[in-house]
């Protein structure tokens, strides 16, 4: 096993999306089930959630395709008390990523808002927040 390589920023973003998008899709599905049983007229809400889930599904497909093109494969995911650990191969090198629960929740909420068509302009990117160039 080779471990000295560090995945590029784009590679890390792909892996992060690969981990987050299935959770977002599960949340949309769970919310659809809850809304369909607790609202008198759930159809409009379910339509919005369905549209959001369809876009997220397309994004996940695109992420997987891009990962294949770039030689990235997640081979292990573990749910830890602190977050989600992923082990992946990036162009022949073994990498590890840990997403803390707070980060996962915050990022998932921002992505969900975007998929639902809500304004996310008040949320700064990591680069903007820490003034990274």
Label for each model-derived stretch:
Residues 35-55:
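Short, flexible N-terminal segments of the mature chain
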């Amino acid at each position: 096993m080779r471990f000295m390589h560090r995945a590029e920023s784009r590679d890390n973003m792909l892996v992060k999306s690969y981990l987050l998008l299935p959770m977002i899709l599960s949340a949309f599905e769970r919310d659809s089930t809850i809304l369909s049983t607790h609202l008198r007229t759930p159809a409009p809400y379910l339509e919005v959630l369905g549209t959001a889930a369809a876009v997220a599904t397309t994004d996940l497909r695109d992420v997987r395709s891009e990962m294949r093109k770039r030689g990235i494969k997640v081979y292990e995911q573990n749910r830890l008390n602190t977050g989600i650990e992923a082990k992946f191969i990036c162009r022949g090198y073994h990498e590890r990523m840990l997403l803390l629960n707070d980060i996962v929740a915050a990022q998932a909420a921002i992505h969900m808002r975007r998929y639902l068509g809500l304004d996310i302009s008040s949320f700064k990117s990591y680069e903007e927040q820490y003034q990274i160039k």
